[in-house]
Regions:
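Ligand-binding loop in jelly-roll beta-barrel domains
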Residues: 96-123
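Glycine- and acidic-residue-biased ligand/ion/polar-headgroup-sensing regions
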Residues: 63-75, 80
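Short acidic-glycine-tyrosine-enriched beta hairpin
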Residues: 15, 81-99
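A hydrophobic, small-residue-rich beta->alpha segment in the mid-to-C-terminal subdomain
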Residues: 111, 122-136
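Conserved short histidine dyad/triad with adjacent acidic residue
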Residues: 30-32, 45-61
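A short, N-terminal "cap"/entry segment at the start of jelly-roll beta-barrel domains
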Residues: 1-43, 135-166
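Hydrophobic small-molecule pocket/channel-lining residues, especially in calycin-type beta-barrels
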Residues: 61, 75, 124, 132, ...
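Tight coil/turn sites that cap or link beta-strands
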Residues: 50-53, 89, 97, 107
Length: 166
């Protein structure tokens, strides 16, 4: 008996030279795989942060979990009400609807592979974030697209206390 194997999407290979890179060293975001390339299964980016630099402010995703794999350095991560420090080789998974944020730990840079699942078409979100960083877009523009990119900004006292000490 033979089975028919029909893939949901074509296998994806993203070559370094073909990767869209946002930001400027040492603070960059490499756009690796958006939801449209994986039939909505996942989205993948790689973020590099300079010593003690902030990454994402406190936010949550209604429909997706987010995984952080620290490739190098040390990363502070808000996961709910707790701030943990993850080191190279550590993995942290944040469930949907859980407030989270991340930054390079004080005195350290961080290189992080981030996977969100199910995937959300978010490359345009990161491009907007880059335009805000360069002063080419208003930070309020991010508030206007929270629903579209399932990135909902909130406050976090534990995160503010932790980062104020940096």
């Amino acid at each position: 008996m033979s089975e028919t194997h029909t893939p949901e999407f074509e296998p994806l290979v993203v070559r370094r030279q073909d990767t869209e890179l946002l930001g400027a060293g040492p603070d960059t975001i490499a756009l690796l795989a958006d939801a449209s390339a994986t039939n909505g299964r996942l989205g993948v980016i790689r973020t590099s942060l300079g010593r003690g630099k902030d990454g994402a402010t406190p936010h949550y995703h209604r429909g997706s979990a987010e995984m952080f794999f620290v490739l190098d350095g040390r990363l502070q991560v808000l996961a709910g009400e707790e701030v943990v420090t993850a080191e190279a080789g550590d993995t942290l998974v944040v469930p949907p609807r859980t407030v989270h944020a991340f930054a390079a730990a004080p005195g350290s840079g961080a290189d992080v592979l981030i996977v969100i699942t199910p995937g959300v078409e978010r490359f345009d979100y990161f491009r907007l974030l880059d335009r805000v960083r360069r002063g080419q877009a208003d930070p309020r523009d991010l508030l206007a697209v929270q629903e579209r990119f399932d990135t909902h900004f909130v406050g976090s006292d534990p995160w503010q206390r932790t980062r104020a000490a940096v």
